[in-house]
Amino acid sequence: MRHYEIVFMVHPDQSEQVPGMIERYTGAITTAGGTIHRMEDWGRRQLAYPIDKLHKAHYVLMNVEAEQAVIDELETNFRFNDAVIRNMIMRTKHAVTEVSPMAKAKEERFVRRDDERREDTVEAASSEE
């Protein structure tokens, strides 16, 4: 089996369908004997350039190990699913399991926000005393 990195972008109006799509695609990979090394839902993000007059899309990243037949089936599903506006499947040499830079940046933003909120509540509590 070979390793692949799969990124697909979903129409922003169809964002509520993304969890079902992820479940369907991961189910197809695992039932065929493949493994999923990394799965990241990056959420809605600004596009670098408009695609079909859209300026945002919902991004999903998957790193999988699977047979070529499964990848061909996924590619066919992407092609005939109108909600998927772009996809990219790249073969990689090794399984990638660490967190991607996009997800790291998102985590850091959440950590900073939590720290700021804690500081605000501590300051508010100390000013009340």
Curated annotation (Swiss-Prot):
GO molecular function, one term: structural constituent of ribosome
Chain positions covered by the region annotation Disordered: 110-129
UniProt keyword Nucleotide-binding, yes or no: no
Biological process terms in GO annotation: translation
InterPro entries: Ribosomal_bS6, Ribosomal_bS6_sf, Ribosomal_S6_plastid/chlpt, Transl_elong_EF1B/ribsomal_bS6
Entry keyword set: Ribonucleoprotein, Ribosomal protein, RNA-binding, rRNA-binding
Keyword Zinc-finger found: no
GO cellular component: cytosolic small ribosomal subunit
Skewed-composition ranges (Basic and acidic residues): 110-121
Function: Binds together with bS18 to 16S ribosomal RNA.
Family (UniProt): Belongs to the bacterial ribosomal protein bS6 family.
HAMAP family membership: Ribosomal_bS6
Protein name, UniProt field: Small ribosomal subunit protein bS6
